Amino acid sequence: MAPTLVSNAIASPTGKAVTLDPVRPNLGVDIAYQKKLDALIARMAAAMNRAILAVYRANPPELAQDESSPAALRAAMNSLGREWAKRFDDFAEHDAKRFVRSATGSADRAFAASLKKAGFTVEFKMGKAASEIITAAVAENVALIKSIPEQYLTQVEGVVMRGVAVGRDLGSVATELQAQFGVTKRRAALIARDQNNKATAAITRARQLEVGSAEAEWVHSAGGRKPRPTHVANNNKKYKIAEGWLDPATDKRIWPGTEINCRCVSRTIIKGLK
């Protein structure tokens, strides 16, 4: 007997509920995005290091006694900061939408495949709900990408000014700058991974509701080094898709993949036809 399809609402014709395979974020999407971010961050860090070290070499440790030297360092950093803020702005405007569409498109294909495996054929379209999700995801991603150079400059300026104040040598400053580069790269990796998780979770939830699914099973992901105990305890438990699950740790309703660095996903439950 063929599955029932009313508008986009579907039901199992056997009378028994069907649990679909979970939709997971496409790892390739965030890896590709992270590589682009890494390359941009590396160029920014290299430019900043060259400018800072050039001023530092021209004013060795005694520069702490010369007020013009800290001013020259700050001017060099601020000038480069403005330049790289513009470059990250351009990157965000051009690449954020492409990234979100890749993440949500991959999720749609994975969900359609899980439905097809269970015997259902559904073609997803770009309706109002999906369009709003993509718009919101792009806006959040743009804001996060634009924050990268601002946060980097703040941290680098702190490293350099502290170095000037205590008369650190060039080697010490260079070591700290390299460490800050690593911090910024790790933050970019988190942004790529977390935004992929969130976009996948949001579009999947919209599609679940679109096909008439009311419940899903929480699937804890063991990918993180510090799993949330409440998420672990909620593994395989059902929740209402429209309402989300009330996490006792935060006393708020959430969905898989929506909390920062949460890699949990869900199994969609297709109700049985009465």
Predicted regions mapped to residue ranges:
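N-terminal leader/targeting and assembly helices and adjacent pre-domain segments
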Residues: 1-182, 270-274
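Acidic, glycine-rich two-metal-ion catalytic cores of nucleic acid-processing enzymes
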Residues: 182-274
